[in-house]
């Protein structure tokens, strides 16, 4: 379960291109039925929390109601990510590899959602993508950014 899906792009996103419940598929041929419009104040509050609390500390700053700036820091984040993945992989043994919610599952979670957040990401400003992605895809996107890059938040 994820509480929000954030549409993020390097291009400004017009309201006509905001994601909505009809934009996204869950991957099993069905739509995200809980993805519904929220009012402007709730959207602003969700964006503030997302940028100031959910994303890696000191890597982003909110510069407008729907605009954030990438400050930098992805190299340190990558070092921490690799260290965490190695630690989780080393915890896997032949005895515990099949445990329910065991170390294999924990490794899988860390690979797919390294930010360990309940958000998914829609990384398309024009509305062509039909699926939301977990935080690893967002961090792959961040790895392509230069410090100072402005990112626009569309639908939430």
What annotation goes with each model-predicted range?
Residues 1, 116-156:
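Acidic, proline/glycine-rich low-complexity IDRs
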Residues 1-34, 147-156:
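Short, extreme N-terminal segment that most often corresponds to the first beta-strand
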Residues 12-17, 43-44, 128-132:
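Short, surface-exposed beta-strand/loop "edge" segments at domain boundaries and coil↔beta transitions
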Residues 15, 19-20, 46-47, 51, ...:
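Generic structural signal of hydrophobic/aromatic residues within well-ordered alpha-helices
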Residues 26-124:
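Low-complexity, serine/threonine/proline-enriched polar segments
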